[in-house]
Regions:
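Conserved core of the PLP fold type I
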Residues: 1-115, 126-143
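Conserved core segment of the aminotransferase class I/II
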Residues: 139-172
Length: 172
């Protein structure tokens, strides 16, 4: 976590059986049947499956060459408020784009203002072809709105399901 710039104690970390279990636990804790969850469109189907299994209505938010379109998410909030937002800011799945710095700031400002939890899927945050990795959203999170999901299964141990969730200690 230190390599991603996340400073936290063990009371803020929950070890899971892969990232998918972390999504499942978040869905069970936050979502009631009929609640809305904002997801990237296109986005990773695994996260969508976990929230759909909890009874969530999935609300797609478009992704472009700068990542999640935060302005679209803000407009969506006026129509139907999601319980949380799921985003992959480092390496968006399936497009591979990274959320721009301006949109990272805008997303966190919106989350703080609206008290809207953001699930950060950092499945491959250390992957880069050139230059340093962008910091995880969780490193910029002042209002404890970000639930950070990571995994070792993709990069280190494909056959071993090992993930983790970093959140405010009260949630863990």
């Amino acid at each position: 976590l230190g390599a991603r710039g996340i400073a936290c104690g063990p009371e803020a970390v929950l070890i899971t059986d892969g990232a998918q279990q972390a999504f499942d636990l978040i869905a069970r804790a936050f979502v009631e049947p009929g609640d809305a969850v904002a997801v990237e469109q296109p986005g990773w189907f695994g996260a969508a499956l976990a929230f759909r299994a909890a009874g969530a209505d999935l609300l797609g938010v478009r992704v472009d060459d700068e990542g999640l379109r935060v302005a679209d998410l803000e407009r969506l909030l006026r129509v139907r408020r999601p319980k949380l937002v799921v985003a992959t800011p480092a390496v968006q799945m399936p497009t591979g784009v990274a959320l721009s710095d301006a949109r990272r700031e805008a997303l966190l400002a919106l989350a703080d203002r609206e008290q809207l939890p953001v699930v950060e899927d950092d499945f491959d945050g250390e992957l880069r072809l050139a230059g340093p990795a962008r910091p995880a959203l969780k490193t910029l999170d002042r209002g404890e709105q970000v639930l950070y999901v990571g995994t070792f299964s993709k990069a280190l141990f494909p056959g071993l399901r090992l993930g983790y969730l970093v959140a405010a200690p009260a949630l863990v």
